[in-house]
Amino acid sequence: MIAPRTRTLSLLAVSTISCLALTGCFSSGSSGSTPAADGDDRVSLAMLQPPRSGLTPLSDDAFKLSRWSAAETLVSLDDLGEAQASLATSWEQSSPTEWTFTIREGVSFHDGTPLAAEDVARSLTAAATASPTPRILDGVDMTAAADNDTTVTVTTAVADPLLPQRMSSPQLSILAASAYEGDTVDPINAGTGPFVLTAVDGTSGATLDRFKDYWGETAAASGIDVQFVPDGTARAAALRTGTADVVEAIPVSQVAQIDEDLVFEVPMPRTNTLYLNTDSGPFADPAVRAAAREAIDRATIVSGVYEGRADVAEGLLGPALPWAADERDNDYQTVLDQRPEAAPVDGVRISLGTFTDRAELPEVAVQLEQQLEAAGFIVEQDVREYQYIEADAVDGAFDAFILSRATVLDSGDPVAYLYSDFACEGSFNLSQFCDPAVDEALEEAAALPAGPERRSAIIAAEAEILARDAAIPMLHERVIQGEAASVEGAVRDPRERALITEETSAR
């Protein structure tokens, strides 16, 4: 599933300022290509974003705790998005709204206290009653109670066939009682993972040490030294100069300055999509939508804007979901073959919106304008910061809108995204789209438990959406991860939940 290593053209000198900005950042770093030299087996990590909420697991900061292997959840997900044992060894559905989880024995928290069912119930209850509600529980009415020392029953107001997958979200990490003693949840010395979070330096960095009493395999590295480095040039310099062992999200523009053997492309569950307003304006006509679809040259956008470091979209769901392509069978194509023929569009005026927060989107808009105008459309662009354009986009103020959209949310399942964007009652329906057949397909998929039947139903719903040209998927994004030559076992995870694990080393 890992994309091939990128090919760089040359090694260029990077900014001296960027190099100086990283000097001294990592306690274990050294110059050259082997930052963990001289017997130092700690891993130095340069991350893109600093914590925004004090590393509370009830926020998106939870994903940092997960990527450091400091906090763990009841279950994990495999490549197909199916639940696997973690802090829970088994689970069963005792009624449509009740699931019982058996808790792993012999697990200790980092503060030395043993894991018991009451700890699980406490953590899940804290998440369920938090304000604001963690994203994974948005719209979910859930309670958790310990049945005894080793089992916990989770109850939902309505049937939730994906509850085990939901339990895999880092926002539902299980922490020791000590984490909940203050006004905010404090993960320091409170997780169960192979690394102990021992210190956090505000928005600058964090320190983790090997947890010798981990219930699984003892960590290969003695610790992790984390620095938060928002500047992309500085992150790239950290890898090139050997200041960091592992680097998140290297900008495409910096890849040419780094040894090609140190950079890896990871497919992301994110699709750059052109949403068409199906309710009003020119694109209310399906034949005009078909004309827009036929006008778009996806490969040119990938090669021009993304320098080839993205995947041409074959559907709404991309390579980050490895099962999706195999599900697009003859029945899928039969549905797509029902799309109308394109109408002539000479002189048809359309408004095209996007935002500047993702630097590539205005460039995509320029490419799209050229392609659409070559087909006969007259395009008027409207590009703003996202905070100033989102409300207009949701209200249907544009004929077309470009969005880089996450297709898999916290449960590892794309149904929530498809419903939000394409159901009649969808909360993020930029296409102003409503079709009974699509709603029926989405409801069928949502009702099925995780597994082959649900995956087939998801792709069937995708076909119904694309057959109506409610949106035109253009490309699937990749993220570029940097790893020093000495690094082994760093995880290249499309879900961005795992990065440094007990198997990671930098020797």
Protein language model features and the residues they cover:
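Ligand-site clamp/hinge motif
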Residues: F211-A256
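Extracytoplasmic/peripheral linker and loop segments enriched in polar/acidic and small residues
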Residues: Q387-I389, Y419-A484
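Long beta-strand-rich cores associated with HINT superfamily self-processing modules
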Residues: Q481-R507
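Gly/Pro-rich hinge or "lid" segments in bacterial periplasmic/extracellular proteins
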Residues: S168-E217, G223
